[in-house]
Design a protein with these regions (language model features):
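Cofactor- and metal-binding active-site motifs of prokaryotic enzymes
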Residues: 1-178
């Protein structure tokens, strides 16, 4: 499976420009940003790559041997990987309401037991999400990895990004088949 990892620093536009330099034509983008820039970065990525699904989270990043809180990391996947992305809203209330949508996305990638993973980033209520995802993924042998956002300033609500937009009380995910 062909993939790309890029790192950028500076203001949102410069960070995205640097991080996607050489990415080409991805079929899916996953990014990790800082709290202060995630909204602008999500919008820039959606504008630069129209029609390409993207998910994003925030926290401390490690990529290409570099570590930091103030950088942007972009991971790109290409057509040799089948991908489906989505968002689950109101996860503190009823994430199971999204089971039908998750199952549809899983079926679209035609997962195999050893070649498919679901990566998720959530704002809260990870324990509810694990149950929701497992009900959709376990029977197909799809592995689940991910976590809760980190690095939210005091007094602010945790957020994640999906296709250029920011969401609270939500989970974004990518199902990736090699």
């Amino acid at each position: 499976m062909k993939s790309y990892v890029g790192i950028g620093k500076g203001n949102a536009a410069d960070a995205v420009g640097e991080a996607v330099k050489g990415i080409g034509n991805p079929s899916c983008i996953i990014f990790l940003s800082s709290f202060g820039q995630i909204g602008e970065i999500a919008a820039i990525i959606a504008e630069k790559f129209p029609g390409v699904p993207s998910i994003g989270t925030l926290g401390t990043k490690l990529a290409n041997g570099k570590y930091g809180d103030d950088n942007l990391v972009v991971l790109g996947f290409y057509d040799d990987a089948k991908t489906e992305c989505g968002v689950i809203n109101d996860i503190s209330l009823c994430p199971v309401a999204s089971i039908g949508d998750i199952k549809d996305k899983v079926n679209k990638v035609s997962p195999g037991r050893e070649n498919t993973v679901c990566i998720e980033f959530c704002t809260n209520d990870e324990e509810k999400l694990v149950t929701t995802f497992n009900s959709c993924l376990a029977q197909k042998g799809v592995k689940l990895a991910g976590g809760t956002v980190f690095g939210v300033p005091d007094g602010k609500k945790p957020i994640v990004a999906y296709n250029g937009k920011i969401f609270e009380d939500s989970c974004v995910y990518a199902i990736i088949k090699n």
